[in-house]
Amino acid sequence: MTIAVIDYGMGNLHSVAKALEHVTHENVVITDDSRSIRGASRLVLPGQGAIRDCMSELQRNDLQGLVQEILRAQGKPLLGICVGQQMLMEESEENGGVPCLGYLPGRVRHFGRDLHDIDGQRLKVPHMGWNRVTQRHAHPLWAGIDDGARFYFVHSYYVEAQEDGDVFGTTDYAGLTPHVATGRGPVFAVQFHPEKSAHDGLRLLENFVNWAP
Amino acid sequence: MALAKRIIPCLDVDAGRVVKGVNFVGIRDAGDPVEVAKRYNQQGADEITFLDITASVEDRGTTVEMVERIAGEVFIPLTVGGGIRTCDDIRTMLNAGADKVSINTAAVTHPEFVHEAAERFGSQCIVVAIDAKRVSAEGETPRWEIFTHGGRTPTGLDAVEWARKMVDLGAGELLLTSMDRDGTKAGFDIGVTRAIADAVSVPVIASGGVGDLDHLVAGVKEGGADAVLAASIFHFGEYTIPDAKRYMAEHGIEMRL
């Protein structure tokens, strides 16, 4: 049994792999090799940086078609993290508009500029730090994690899924309710960084490793 | 507002050991970075900043190794600063397990590097470190300038304007250190913290001068900081992270407890 962290040249691969190794004895590989990716029992799609670069690196490494094929086949669990969550949507408004993988209906939007809270305090973008995640629907990946637990975020764009059934978790920021945990079938994706969210983050990764959708 | 303010212990690391200078002289040894980072993680630190102050190029490899070891055991965000000058430096640190890099001198000498780095890696992992020093006299309208080389070299750049420029170029966060206060334990320079926090759209980390827990509260409530960074009050056991978090929460600040 192998968990493959898809390496397309972007993303915090070391952190994700180390955190997975911390919660499982299964083999964790960081790979861009299509045979290893096909052969893995589970996949992690990380993402860091600008989404235009993430999508173009995925294409340049001939991995976009493979990932789409795997998503269509619905055969193995896949966890998207950060920009990896965003890439599963239809398109992002970052970098002037970028088409994405289109696994879930909906788009990726910017928080906006010059935001203020009700006290007039300036709200910062990126949304950076530990925020509470409300669990909208039950999911095996929430096992053992309190509703409202804090996870670590750092992002300026957020997912807005079209269908409520695809939304498993939300947070509150800038008067918005970003869809920070989304999924369908064997796919689960989070905007926050479970690999950087201390105990609850490791628990989510452990749940992913044990998930049998 | 549910987003918590952050407490960030800072590890100043020289040739593989945590040190903390008092006004950058009189360095005391505070231990192995990996052990120190693990302790802070267990205590519930919200992030860790690793500042490489190693002077010699040969010892830089040690830093990468340290970052790898910390990232293998500590599952909270890790920022690495010190000597970040090229996109290759950034790539190396991110691959070693850093989540963000902090750019200091290179931002002053080559501001376009901040833009290049943000375009390549995303603003969210680009922190610009701003070392500011008050240049106005007592009674004058307060003014701060950017200093480099540990506060020794003036640049003539206005700190608030500089902060705005760095954000325009793509900085995702600012690490603001008062060079007047660093190492003094007299508290943050609230004036410059407030001025910059109000001037920019990105999070500001207040740094330099923390001597007690009231200083942390003031950094957030009066300074408007999104995060507070401290070293010596934690390194030498005066306060623990939970002490600090409880105290700040008691003062009405949203914290991750």
From Swiss-Prot, chain B:
Record's keyword terms, sorted? Amino-acid biosynthesis, Cytoplasm, Histidine biosynthesis, Lyase
- Can you state which reaction this protein catalyses? 5-[(5-phospho-1-deoxy-D-ribulos-1-ylimino)methylamino]-1-(5-phospho-beta-D-ribosyl)imidazole-4-carboxamide + L-glutamine = D-erythro-1-(imidazol-4-yl)glycerol 3-phosphate + 5-amino-1-(5-phospho-beta-D-ribosyl)imidazole-4-carboxamide + L-glutamate + H(+)
- Catalytic residues at D12, D131
Taxonomic superkingdom = Bacteria
- Gene3D superfamilies annotated for this entry? Aldolase class I
Pathway(s): Amino-acid biosynthesis; L-histidine biosynthesis; L-histidine from 5-phospho-alpha-D-ribose 1-diphosphate: step 5/9
What's its EC?
Answer: 4.3.2.10
Keyword Lyase listed: yes
Q: Name one GO cellular component term.
A: cytoplasm
Q: Which GO terms describe its molecular function?
A: imidazoleglycerol-phosphate synthase activity; lyase activity
User: What function does this protein fulfil?
Assistant: IGPS catalyzes the conversion of PRFAR and glutamine to IGP, AICAR and glutamate. The HisF subunit catalyzes the cyclization activity that produces IGP and AICAR from PRFAR using the ammonia provided by the HisH subunit.
PANTHER family per record: IMIDAZOLE GLYCEROL PHOSPHATE SYNTHASE HISHF, IMIDAZOLE GLYCEROL PHOSPHATE SYNTHASE SUBUNIT HISF/H IGP SYNTHASE SUBUNIT HISF/H
- How does this chain assemble? Heterodimer of HisH and HisF.
- Give the protein's recorded name: Imidazole glycerol phosphate synthase subunit HisF
Q: Which organism is it from?
A: Chromohalobacter salexigens (strain ATCC BAA-138 / DSM 3043 / CIP 106854 / NCIMB 13768 / 1H11)
State the taxonomy lineage. Answer: Bacteria, Pseudomonadati, Pseudomonadota, Gammaproteobacteria, Oceanospirillales
